[in-house]
Swiss-Prot record:
Keywords carried by this UniProt record: Cytoplasm, Hydrolase, Protease, Thiol protease
Family as reported in the entry's similarity comment: Belongs to the peptidase C15 family.
Record-given protein name: Pyrrolidone-carboxylate peptidase
Quaternary structure, from the entry: Homotetramer.
EC numbers for this chain: 3.4.19.3
Source species: Bacillus velezensis (strain DSM 23117 / BGSC 10A6 / LMG 26770 / FZB42)
């Protein structure tokens, strides 16, 4: 059965001129492979406004699966996130100058939400194509985690039939010309996200493999 997969990517932030999350996601708009039919939307790197845009995208597309994607400069792998926490703690301002500290995303909401995606399976499928990938256990405390938590809160409260989650991606090479940081080509990032969408559409259950972090 075909599943509509909504992918979201952010606009540039923190002085960058591109955001690879949107550059990759927009390439996949209208793509179809296996059980996945993909639609793409951009969200602003702004606390709360990003959630409002996401809610409108849900109304517009009525997806079965939502995968939000964000840039994690410094990471070397495609990293599906395991958990979102109920905390805004911004080291830098967002794109409208907001810099919340020690603030709950949802007053009265749970401390954390688990992903609804088969992230270990996604990682294995991406690695089969020679693309580095690993499960991540922290999505940070900036707008990426904010959107991830807000997505799972929205799903839990209003759309229990939707499965959702978040994937962080590295810089693309053009972002590292003036700094020493790992990067991954846009082609490989795009390929990995397509694999993630198809895998999520094909499988609800995750695989049982060892993982975790020691510190």
């Amino acid at each position: 059965m075909e599943k509509k997969v909504l992918l979201t990517g952010f606009d540039p932030f923190g002085g960058e001129t591109v955001n690879p999350s949107w550059e990759a996601v927009k390439r996949l708009n209208g793509a179809a492979e296996g059980p996945a039919s993909i639609v793409s939307e951009q969200v602003p790197t702004v606390f709360y406004k990003s959630l409002a845009v996401l809610r409108e995208a849900i109304k517009k597309h009525q997806p079965d699966i939502i995968i939000c994607v964000g840039q994690a400069g410094g990471r070397m792998q495609i990293t599906p996130e395991r958990v979102a926490i109920n905390l805004n703690e911004a080291r830098i301002p967002d794109n409208e100058g907001n810099q919340p500290v020690g603030e709950n995303i949802s007053q009265g909401g749970p401390a954390a939400y688990w992903t609804g995606l088969p992230i270990k399976r996604i990682v294995e499928e991406i690695k089969k194509e020679g693309i580095p990938a690993a499960v991540s256990y922290t999505a940070g405390t900036f707008v990426c985690n904010h959107l991830f938590y807000g997505l799972m809160d929205e799903i839990t409260r209003h759309h229990p039939h939707i499965r959702g989650g978040f994937i962080h991606i590295p810089y693309i090479p053009e972002q590292t010309l003036q700094k020493s940081a790992p990067s991954l080509s846009l082609d490989l990032v795009t390929k990995a996200l397509k694999i993630a969408a198809v895998t999520a559409a094909a499988h609800e259950d995750d695989i049982e493999t060892g993982g975790g972090e020691l510190h």
